[in-house]
Swiss-Prot record:
One of its GO terms (cellular component) is cilium. InterPro entries: CEP15-like (IPR028006). Pfam families: CEP15-like. This is Centrosomal protein 15. The lineage of its organism: Eukaryota, Metazoa, Chordata, Craniata, Vertebrata.
Length: 127
């Protein structure tokens, strides 16, 4: 009977040790999850702060670029605007000829001076 009693005492002590270890582990887990949540919240706040900063920087860069462009070319000269308009009109006029040539449906659109290059260019266009 004494051995059962000592065994019961031993098991009771072991049970108390296990419970204290369990309590200690639960406390560590709580601390760890608390630290992770704190770290996660801190990281989220840092991310939001960085996003706001990056957005401000992008706006500043856009504003600086716009200011630079206006200083670089304040107003194009009328002669330059006229030249640009005539250039684009010429391009639009010649697009159909070149389009057919590049699709391989028409001969080289400009005079005969470059006729020796035509077969190469046309074969390239057909590929």
């Amino acid at each position: 009977m004494a051995s059962l009693f000592t065994q019961e005492i031993h098991l009771s002590k072991r049970h108390e040790e296990i419970l204290s270890q369990r309590l200690m582990l639960l406390q560590k887990m709580k601390n760890k999850f608390g630290d992770e949540n704190t770290e996660r919240a801190s990281l989220l706040q840092a991310t939001e702060t960085a996003s706001r900063r990056n957005l401000r920087l992008l706006k500043d860069i856009d504003a600086a670029e716009e200011a630079f462009q206006t200083k670089l070319i304040p107003h194009p000269q009328p002669s330059m605007l006229s030249l640009e308009t005539r250039y684009w009109a010429s391009v639009e006029e010649h697009i159909p000829k070149w389009e057919l040539f590049l699709l391989g449906r028409a001969p080289y659109p400009i005079g005969a001076e470059n006729q020796n290059e035509v077969p190469f260019v046309q074969t390239e266009a057909k590929l």
